[in-house]
Regions:
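Short alpha-helix capping/helix-loop boundary micro-motifs
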Residues: 262-266
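OB-fold (S1/OB) nucleic-acid-binding surfaces
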Residues: 188-192, 254-259
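ABC ATPase nucleotide-binding domains
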Residues: 16-18, 22-167
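Glycine/charge-rich catalytic "coupling/switch" loops of P-loop NTPases
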Residues: 189-243, 268-296
Length: 296
C-alpha cells in the first residue's frame, strides 16, 4: 500500500499501521478499556466494546478492564499496549524494542505470548531490536542494518550460518578473528589452510569463527606437543582467564604464535587455571573468510 510519494500522502492516522512503543506510552488518565479502544474509530459502541473485551481476554487482562495503567505491572502494561495497537486491525505493526523494559524471565514469557497473539491475528510485524536472541526467537525473516542500510536479509538460520561480513557474525555472538594472507586461493593460518576462492593472491583476509567453534583438545591439555595433523590444524595456547557463565564456561586464551587472544565456550563447568597450556583446533566448516576491506 502506497502511503507517500512526491505528490501523494496518506495522513498517519489513516495508514492502518499499529505502533508499539519501547516505553508502552499508555495514557495514564484513561482506563485500560479506553486505552485499548483509543484507535477504534469505526463501528457501533457495542462493536467497539466487544473488540476491547476480545483483546483484553486474549492478553488475559479482562479483569483489569476498568483499571488504570498505574495499577498494572510492567508486563501487564506491555500487554495493554499490544492490545491497543492491535485493536483497529492494522495491516502492519511497528514494534520499537517493546520488551527491553522487562526483566529477563518476564521478557521471555511476554515475547512468546506476544508472538502467539500476533500469529493468531495474522498481522505482519516489523520489530526493531538490538538483541540477537530476540531476533532469532521472534522473526520469520531478519534484516541486519548498518549505517541506515540493510546489509543482509533472510531467514534466521541463513543469516546466522551464512553471514556476509565480519560484523554480521558479531551481531549474533562474540567473534574470534584470525588475520591471514591469501596465496593460491588459500588463507594460511596457525590452524591450517582455509579456502578463499576468488580472492587474489596477497589479499589480507579475516577468518572469523564463534567461540563455540574453538575446540580444546582435552586429551592433550597440559601435556607435551601435539603431533601436527596433515593440514596443521592444532595450535598451542595459554589460558589467560576462565569464567563460569551459568550454562557454559568462557575461556580466554593467548595464542603462542603471535600473542593474540581467542575465546572458547565450553558446556557446563570448565575453569582451568591461568597459565595452563592447551591445544586448540577450530571447526573448519564453521569458519568464514572475508577480505579485510569487506570485514565490516
Amino acid at each position: 500500500k502506497l502511503i507517500c510519494d512526491t505528490v501523494f500522502r496518506v495522513p498517519p492516522e489513516r495508514r492502518e499501521i499499529g505502533l508499539m512503543f519501547q516505553d508502552f506510552a499508555l495514557f495514564p488518565h484513561l482506563s485500560v478499556a479506553d486505552n485499548v479502544g483509543f484507535g477504534l474509530k469505526t463501528g457501533t459502541k457495542a462493536e467497539r466494546r466487544a473488540r476491547i473485551e476480545e483483546l483484553l481476554e486474549r492478553v488475559d487482562l479482562l479483569r483489569f478492564i476498568d483499571g488504570y495503567p498505574h495499577q498494572l505491572s510492567g508486563g501487564e502494561q506491555q500487554r495493554v499496549a499490544l492490545a491497543r495497537a492491535l485493536a483497529p486491525r492494522p495491516k502492519i505493526m511497528l514494534m520499537d524494542e517493546p520488551f527491553s523494559g522487562l526483566d529477563n524471565r518476564l521478557r521471555d514469557d511476554i515475547r512468546d505470548e506476544t508472538l502467539g497473539i500476533l500469529k493468531e491475528e495474522g498481522t505482519a510485524v516489523l520489530l526493531v531490536t538490538h538483541e540477537p536472541e530476540e531476533a532469532m526467537r521472534m522473526a520469520d525473516e531478519i534484516a541486519l542494518m548498518r549505517d541506515g542500510k540493510i546489509v543482509q536479509q533472510g531467514a534466521p538460520y541463513n543469516v546466522y550460518t551464512r553471514p556476509v561480513d565480519r560484523a554480521s557474525v558479531a551481531f549474533f555472538s562474540d567473534a574470534n578473528v584470525l588475520r591471514a594472507e591469501v596465496s593460491g586461493a588459500l588463507a594460511h593460518t596457525v590452524f591450517g589452510r582455509f579456502l578463499a576462492p576468488g580472492v587474489p593472491d596477497g589479499t589480507q583476509v579475516d577468518i572469523v569463527f564463534r567461540p563455540q567453534h574453538l575446540r580444546i583438545d582435552f586429551d592433550r591439555a597440559g601435556k607435551g606437543p601435539l603431533p601436527t595433523s596433515t593440514d596443521g590444524t592444532a595450535a598451542r595456547a595459554v589460558v589467560a582467564r576462565a569464567r563460569f557463565m551459568g550454562n557454559e564456561s568462557l575461556v580466554e586464551f593467548v595464542m603462542d604464535h603471535d600473542g593474540s587472544t581467542l575465546r572458547a565456550t565450553v558446556p557446563n563447568v570448565f575453569l582451568p587455571q591461568p597459565g595452563a597450556v592447551m591445544w586448540l583446533t577450530v571447526r573448519r566448516d564453521r569458519c568464514f573468510v572475508f577480505p579485510v576491506h569487506a570485514a565490516g
